[in-house]
Amino acid sequence: MNFNALTEYLKTLEGELGLAGYDCAVYLDGGEVYRRMEGYADREASRPIAHDTIYRMFSMTKPITCTAAMQLYERGKFLLTDPLGNYLPEFREMTVREGDSLRPARNPITIRNLFTMSAGLTYDLDSPSMQAMKRDTAGQYTTRQLVQALAQEPLTYDPGEHWAYSLAHDVLGALIEEVSGLPFEEYLQRHIFAPLGMKDAHFFVPEDKLGRVAYRYGCERGKAPVREAYENLYQASPNYRSGGAGLSCTLDDYARFACALCRGGWCEQTHTRILGSATVRLMRENQLSDVQMRDFNWVQYAGYGYGLGVRTLVSRAGSGSPGGLGEFGWGGAAGTYALIDPEYRLVMLFGQQSTPAFEHIIQPRIRNILYRCLEEV
């Protein structure tokens, strides 16, 4: 292996895209084989990116939530085909907006629809029902209260007909609470974080760790990065634990999780299994119909389908990726990125906190460079 080409590309990111800092890590068979950290977590204080830097993961929370839910699936707590309303009654009688009117939904929302973002839900945190719930709770709402407010709003399409990014994985967090009998955060701590040794994974970073958090910067080509005021709408209430966008952790912590999935659910460092290998294979199988594949049209994910909470490579030609079919993972709003390729026994993680995140520029390039580096001498 020779990672010189990857290093040379990464060196261009600060100058060409204006990134304040980044961290790129590569793992083979669960062991780190490459690491490059450059720039600052706090540019103004000259605090560099380091192994213990904590990143706001935003949507990279989603694969963790889906893994937790699939643990309960493995225990027979639900079937993917079960109507969601069997567990969360607020979703039993859903309506669909059609023009200026509403009609009853033709299909019930299934649990599979939550995993696959095909439930007809939205990402609207400012709907009339959400506003009323926030007033009624004086902004101290729980995960379940947010989900109950979401259920009062009409769906945008009949469940199962389309794909649309939404609060579906936040609903999965409420489902986990209902079927496990544990608060969502406690479930993750007991069944994901502690077994994997993820010591810095939090929905709300403790005060004694705040000095390790990477700031988010507005970035523009050829200009110095500008620090942005931190805002995460998915941490707006101290009682809300967002299964879709709420977690923060170090790249080293996330590597424990990603490498376990790459090894079929087995964590070599702690000798712990968090999922069965057959379940991991199911998670990374494309679940979308032809119609839904047309909806899943994000430019950085051309050639990918969508499984149970993760993108999954279905066409090398369509993506321009040399990776193995079934390579999977996800990314976060501030530019974090996970690539998991069981065929190559490979994990790559990229950490940054920037707006825009330049996903369509950075992610496919570091992916493509990586596979050549594995064979270089």
Each PLM stretch: what is its role?
Residues 92-322:
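Short, surface-exposed loop or secondary-structure junction motifs
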Residues 3-57, 77, 93-99, 232, ...:
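Short, conserved catalytic-motif segment at the N-terminal edge
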Residues 353-377:
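Generic C-terminus detector
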Residues 4-10, 30, 56-84, 169-177, ...:
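Active-site SXXK
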Residues 36, 338-339, 345-354:
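Short, well-ordered beta-strand elements
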Residues 37-39, 83, 229, 352:
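Short clusters of small/polar residues that mark proteolytic maturation junctions
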